């Protein structure tokens, strides 16, 4: 299940682009806590701490206890923006979690047993169709990863979502089809050129022309 962490934040006074730039110059990142029937609460967070959490992975499926001026709120990140050039966080949104709440989250898939997959051992290639699956999950038991086992997959076979065991209390958002998760693509076989065809080709791909026949000797009169 998703790991729970503690995050410190402060109340953000100003809003807008100018205030956000000023906050970033101070080494902090603007954010907001919303949902749960309460008013949105603008906050700021430490840049280094937030940057580390984002790039550690599973950020959007991690539950946080955010402490704002001594009061803790249980939240989950719902979105964040990165600088398109530097890759640094610019803003982050958190959703409040109330007891008994249900969320829609995109949970990443982890593929295991590739080393014993018969299709891969025979030269096939793993083609991952989906890297994550959207689920309805209980807020207090949110999975951070799903496991897809490749141990029995043969060449040209596909794995569908029905092959993945979902954690208790979790269900698929899309229930109208058994969609594909991954396939084992057959190896590409390159046919060799026929020897006779290759031998008949000279430089430039053309055969040598036959020598002209000798001219007949003139008849004696």
Curated annotation (Swiss-Prot):
Low complexity biased stretches: 208-221
Name of the gene encoding the protein in the UniProt record: rplY
Molecular functions (GO terms): 5S rRNA binding; structural constituent of ribosome
Gene Ontology biological process terms in this record: translation
Name of this protein: Large ribosomal subunit protein bL25
Coiled-coil region(s): none
UniProt xrefs under CDD domains: Ribosomal_L25_TL5_CTC
Region (Disordered): 198-221
Native source species: Beijerinckia indica subsp. indica (strain ATCC 9039 / DSM 1715 / NCIMB 8712)
């Amino acid at each position: 299940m998703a790991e729970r962490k503690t995050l410190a934040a402060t109340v953000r006074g100003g809003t807008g682009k100018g205030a956000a730039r000023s906050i970033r110059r101070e080494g902090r990142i603007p954010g907001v806590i919303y949902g749960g029937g309460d008013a949105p609460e603008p906050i700021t967070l430490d840049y280094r701490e937030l940057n580390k959490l984002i790039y550690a992975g599973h950020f959007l499926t991690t539950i946080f206890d955010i402490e704002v001026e001594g009061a803790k709120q249980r939240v989950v990140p719902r979105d964040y923006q990165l600088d398109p050039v530097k890759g640094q966080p610019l803003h982050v949104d958190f959703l409040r979690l109330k007891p008994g709440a249900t969320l829609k989250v995109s949970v990443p898939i982890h593929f295991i047993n590739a080393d014993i997959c018969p299709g891969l051992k025979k030269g096939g290639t793993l083609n991952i169709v989906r890297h994550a699956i959207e689920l309805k999950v209980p807020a207090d038991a949110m999975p951070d990863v799903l496991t897809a086992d490749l141990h029995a997959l043969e060449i040209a076979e596909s794995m569908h979502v029905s092959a993945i065991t979902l954690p208790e209390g979790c269900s698929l958002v899309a229930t109208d089809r058994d969609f594909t998760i991954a396939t084992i693509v057959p190896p590409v076989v390159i046919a060799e050129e026929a020897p006779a065809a290759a031998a008949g080709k000279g430089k430039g791909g053309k055969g040598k022309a036959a020598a002209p026949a000798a001219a007949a000797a003139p008849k004696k009169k």
